[in-house]
C-alpha cells in the first residue's frame, strides 16, 4: 500500500462546522465545500485552492493562497456543484432556495462577503431560485450545462433552464417521498432520483416522464440517511446508488442501463452507505491472463466512517478499505484526477492519493468519446476535451491566469455559444486597449505635473536671501499653477484642426464553405429570365443607394462601411432534434410559437423577413409578415451625427397579413417559406411578395428549408416532404423517417436539407447519411459509422479536395464527409478486407451523389472511386465504369457533366495509376463501343 497514502489538510474546514458536500472544479485547480458554520445555524460555502491540498510543498508556501472565496448564508447549505463550464456554482439550502454564483475575476483588496477571511476571487450572485417550499437537499447540473435540477423535502424536482435562469423547464411532481439524491446520465438521456431511500426513478430528458421505478433494493432499508449521493459510471452503463440493503447488509446497488437489472452490488460496509462517486473516466487494468480491460473505479462512503475503493465489473471485493478515516459519517466525494477528496460531517476533508500502479491507467477523453459513440452514437460534451487541453488545465495554480483558466475550461455545445464567446473576446480586447491608452495618458499627465511641481518648489527655495548680518529677506517670485487654465486649454484646442482617424473597413471575404453542422447545398442550376431581371433590379437599387450615400458624405470625412453591406451572414447550424419512436412512427417536437421572428434571406445582403405574431390593427390581432432591407443612413453634415454613429434605416419592400401564427421561417432569393400553426406551408415570391401556394401538412412543421426553387418540410409525425417549386410538382411525399431510424439506439436528427432538384439529404447523430431515390421510391443509405468503419481506412480531407481543387467548389455531400469524425482502422485487419469495405463505401457514396444531382459531388466521388480501384487493381470494376460512361443510348450528361469528359478524366487517371490495366481495358471498351454503334 505504499502507492496509496492519505493526507489531512488542516486549513480546510468550516471552523469545526460540518461539511456536507464537496465538488472539484472542471479544471482541477480548485474545489468547493458547503455545510454549516460552527456554533451557528448559518450555512457556509467556501472555494478552496486545490494545489496546497494535493502538494505538501505548496501547502507550506505562504505565497500560495489557500482560501479563494467564501460566502455565508442564513441557513445550512446541503449541496453544492460546479457547472460543467466552471464559470458558476450552485448550492441548495435549508431556506428552500437555490443560489447560483458566477465568477467575475480576481480582487485586489482582501476581504469576504459576510465573513472575516480573505478572498482572492470575486463571485457575484447572479440568481436565487425560490421554487421549493421546504429544504433543498440536492442540486445537479446536466453534463451539457443546459439544465439545473434541484430536489427538496417538498416531494418535488424542479428543472431549470441553466442558460436562462430563473426560467423553468418543468416540475416533476409525481413523487411520494423527499428527494435526497439526483444524478444526470453522462449521455444526457436520463435523470435519476432517489426518494427517501425507498424508491429510485429514471426520468427521460426528452419527455420528462418517469420511464422506470426501482424499489426492490430498498424494501428492507430501515436506516435512512440525511443526504444521499448517487452517481453514474463514466460510460453510462451503470447507475450506482447507495442506501440499498440485501439480507440486512448495506451495499451499493448497480442498476444496468436499459435493462434496469439490479443483480450486481458492492458490499462490505457495516452501516448504511451514504455516497458513491466514480472517477471521471474509465481505467485500463491488466488482467492475469495478459488482457487489458476497461473498468470503472468508484469510491463508496458509509456511516461506519470508512471508505472503500472499487473497480468493476468483475470484482467481488474492494480494491482496498480505509477504516475509521473520519469521526463521523462520510458525506460526499470529489475526484481531482487520481486524487480522491472526501468530506465528513465532522467538518474535515481527507485526500486519498492513488497511484497508477494501484488503480490502473486512466483512458483519454478521446477514447471515452469514441467508446460512447460506439455504444450510443453520441459523443458527450464532457469527453470532447483533448488530452492536450486537459494537461494545460492541470497546470500549476497562477493567480494571473485564473480568469483565463476558467474560460478555457468551458466547452461549446451550440453555435450561439461560439458567437457569444467571440463577441466577449473582441470586447475584452477593445476594453484592454482603451484602458492601456488611458493609463498611458494619465501617466504622462502625472509625470508632467510632478515635474512642474518640482520646478516650482525649486524656485520657491530661491526666494530666501540671507544677508551678511545673518538676516533673511524673502524676494517676490512669480509662482504659476501646475495645471493649465481650462479656458486657455479649450481655446488652444479649438484652434487646432485634428484630422479624423481613418475608418476601419472590413475586407470583403471570399465565399467560405458551410461551417460545422450546416448542410448548405451548392447553387448549380441556372436561373430563369425573370429571376435574372429581379436580381438585376435589386443590384441596381443597391448601386443607386451607394451613389446617394457618396453624394451626401463630405470628401474630408471617412465613413465606415456598414457590416450588413459587407458580408453575407453565415448560416447557423441547426440544433439536434431528438427522435422518439412509438408504435412504428417517429415523433418530434415542433418549435414553440414566438411573438416575433426574424430570418435572414440567403444570398440577399441586409435583407430580412420579419414576423410579428401579435400584430394588432383595427382591434384585430393577426400575424404580419414584412420583407425589409436594412440600409445605412448617413447624415449630410457632422452636426447631425452623434459620436460618429451611423443609423440604420429599415426599408419595407412588401407586407402580407395572415390569420394563423408563423412558427418557423426559411427564405432565399427566390422564395419565402413560412411554417404556420394551422399545419400549412405557405410560399411567397421574395421579389414581390406574391402568394404562390399554401401546402397542407399532416401535422405541425418541425423543420423547413429552401434551396434555389426546392423546399422541404419535416413534421411532428416524422414525415418528410419535398417540392420542386419551379416545376410545381412534389418530389417526396410524406415519407416517414421511421424507415431510417434505429429504434433500439439513442438517436437524433443532426441536419436536413434538400438539393436543387428536390432530393433530400438527412444526417443522424450516429453518423448515418440518407438520401431518397425518386425512381425506386425508397431511402438510400449513403454511409454509416458502424463497425465497418474500423475495417477500412478513412477518407481524408485531402482526398476529398484533390478532385475539386478548392473547398469552395465542394458539394453538400463532400462537406458532410469532411465534418464527420474519422474512425481509426482496427489493428490486424487484412488488406483485402480494407480494400473490399472501402470500395463498397465509395460505391454507396457515388450512388448518393448521383441522386443529389450535384456535379461537384459526383465528380469528386467518381474520381476518388476510380483512384481507389486503381490502387487495389480492380480491373473488372474499372472496365465497368468505362462501359457505363460510354454505353450507347445513355443520356449525354450525368449530374450536369458530359459523359465524354468524364470518360476522358477516368481514362487519364487509369493510365497514370495503372498503365498495364489501361492498355487492356481502354482498347476493349473502345472496340465494344464501336461494335455496338455499327448495329
Curated annotation (Swiss-Prot):
Q: Which UniProt keywords apply?
A: Chromatin regulator, Nucleus, Repeat, Repressor, Transcription, Transcription regulation, WD repeat
A GO cellular-component term linked to this record:
nucleus
Compartment annotation: Nucleus
**WD repeats at which positions?**
14-58, 72-111, 131-170, 174-213, 222-261, 277-320, 325-362
Cite the record's Polar residues compositional bias ranges.
Answer: 480-492
Q: Where is this region: Disordered?
A: 431-556
- Residue ranges, compositional bias (Basic and acidic residues): 439-468
SUPFAM superfamilies in the cross-refs:
WD40 repeat-like (SSF50978)
The disulfide bridges present are: none
What does the record list as GO biological process?
chromatin remodeling; DNA-templated transcription; regulation of DNA-templated transcription
Task: Extract the SMART domains matched here.
Answer: WD40
**InterPro entries in UniProt:** CAF1B_HIR1_beta-prop (IPR055410), HIR1-like (IPR031120), HIRA-like_C (IPR011494), HIRA_B_motif (IPR019015), WD40/YVTN_repeat-like_dom_sf (IPR015943), WD40_repeat_dom_sf (IPR036322), WD40_rpt (IPR001680)
Q: Where is the composition biased (Acidic residues)?
A: 520-542
RNA-binding keyword on record: no
Pfam families named in the record: Beta-prop_CAF1B_HIR1 (PF24105), Hira (PF07569), HIRA_B (PF09453)
What does it do? Required for replication-independent chromatin assembly and for the periodic repression of histone gene transcription during the cell cycle.
The text of the family note is: Belongs to the WD repeat HIR1 family.
From the Swiss-Prot or TrEMBL record, give the protein name.
Protein HIRA
Organism field:
Caenorhabditis elegans
